[in-house]
Amino acid sequence: MPLASPRQLFLLAFLACVAIMGGALYLEHVVGLEACPLCVVQRIFFILIGLTCLAGAIQGPGLRGRRIYSVLVFLLALGGGATAARQVWLQTVPLDQLPACLPSLDYMMQALPFQEVIRLVLHGTADCAQVSWTLFTLSIPEWSLLAFVAYLGFSIVQFLRRA
């Protein structure tokens, strides 16, 4: 007999996303850390994963629906993981080899075409390479990458599960 139903697991995954976003907002508004553009993209991926898991928890789909939700979570976690991995890589590059800092995301959205904003944000800057906070010697993007890997594992388990 399984320990938890797929519906309960989707709810648990949603609550984990809520906790992750709560932690991100705490670090931004209480601790005072400014989110770089890659951090904002990772937050968007966490929100989309959370909404997908919430939909799966509310609907309580059958096998086919659960697999569809699992594939969506997998793809979103893959995108978020790639973004987090890019930021982790940027943190290893010497500062003199990084591109200059970008203007705020709000300004870029108003002044530049959308495709250019996406290209600049995903390219990363010196802002994204700065390690301003760690927990157990892991930076925020490293924790984010671990969370995305956990969501990849979750989606695979949900996809392969029969009951």
Swiss-Prot record:
<keyword id="KW-0472">Membrane</keyword>
<dbReference type="InterPro" id="IPR022920">
    <property type="entry name" value="Disulphide_bond_form_DsbB"/>
</dbReference>
<dbReference type="InterPro" id="IPR050183">
    <property type="entry name" value="DsbB"/>
</dbReference>
<keyword id="KW-1015">Disulfide bond</keyword>
<comment type="function">
    <text>Required for disulfide bond formation in some periplasmic proteins. Acts by oxidizing the DsbA protein.</text>
</comment>
<feature type="topological domain" description="Periplasmic">
    <location>
        <begin position="86"/>
        <end position="142"/>
    </location>
</feature>
<dbReference type="GO" id="GO:0005886">
    <property type="term" value="C:plasma membrane"/>
</dbReference>
<comment type="similarity">
    <text>Belongs to the DsbB family.</text>
</comment>
<feature type="disulfide bond" description="Redox-active">
    <location>
        <begin position="36"/>
        <end position="39"/>
    </location>
</feature>
<keyword id="KW-0997">Cell inner membrane</keyword>
<keyword id="KW-1003">Cell membrane</keyword>
<feature type="transmembrane region" description="Helical">
    <location>
        <begin position="10"/>
        <end position="26"/>
    </location>
</feature>
<keyword id="KW-0143">Chaperone</keyword>
<feature type="topological domain" description="Cytoplasmic">
    <location>
        <begin position="1"/>
        <end position="9"/>
    </location>
</feature>
<feature type="topological domain" description="Cytoplasmic">
    <location>
        <begin position="162"/>
        <end position="163"/>
    </location>
</feature>
<dbReference type="InterPro" id="IPR003752">
    <property type="entry name" value="DiS_bond_form_DsbB/BdbC"/>
</dbReference>
<keyword id="KW-0676">Redox-active center</keyword>
<keyword id="KW-0249">Electron transport</keyword>
<protein>
    <recommendedName>
        <fullName>Disulfide bond formation protein B 1</fullName>
    </recommendedName>
</protein>
<feature type="transmembrane region" description="Helical">
    <location>
        <begin position="143"/>
        <end position="161"/>
    </location>
</feature>
<keyword id="KW-0813">Transport</keyword>
<keyword id="KW-0812">Transmembrane</keyword>
<dbReference type="Pfam" id="PF02600">
    <property type="entry name" value="DsbB"/>
</dbReference>
<dbReference type="GO" id="GO:0006457">
    <property type="term" value="P:protein folding"/>
</dbReference>
<feature type="topological domain" description="Periplasmic">
    <location>
        <begin position="27"/>
        <end position="44"/>
    </location>
</feature>
<feature type="topological domain" description="Cytoplasmic">
    <location>
        <begin position="62"/>
        <end position="67"/>
    </location>
</feature>
<feature type="transmembrane region" description="Helical">
    <location>
        <begin position="45"/>
        <end position="61"/>
    </location>
</feature>
<keyword id="KW-1133">Transmembrane helix</keyword>
<keyword id="KW-0560">Oxidoreductase</keyword>
<dbReference type="InterPro" id="IPR023380">
    <property type="entry name" value="DsbB-like_sf"/>
</dbReference>
<dbReference type="GO" id="GO:0015035">
    <property type="term" value="F:protein-disulfide reductase activity"/>
</dbReference>
<feature type="transmembrane region" description="Helical">
    <location>
        <begin position="68"/>
        <end position="85"/>
    </location>
</feature>
<dbReference type="GO" id="GO:0009055">
    <property type="term" value="F:electron transfer activity"/>
</dbReference>
<feature type="disulfide bond" description="Redox-active">
    <location>
        <begin position="101"/>
        <end position="128"/>
    </location>
</feature>
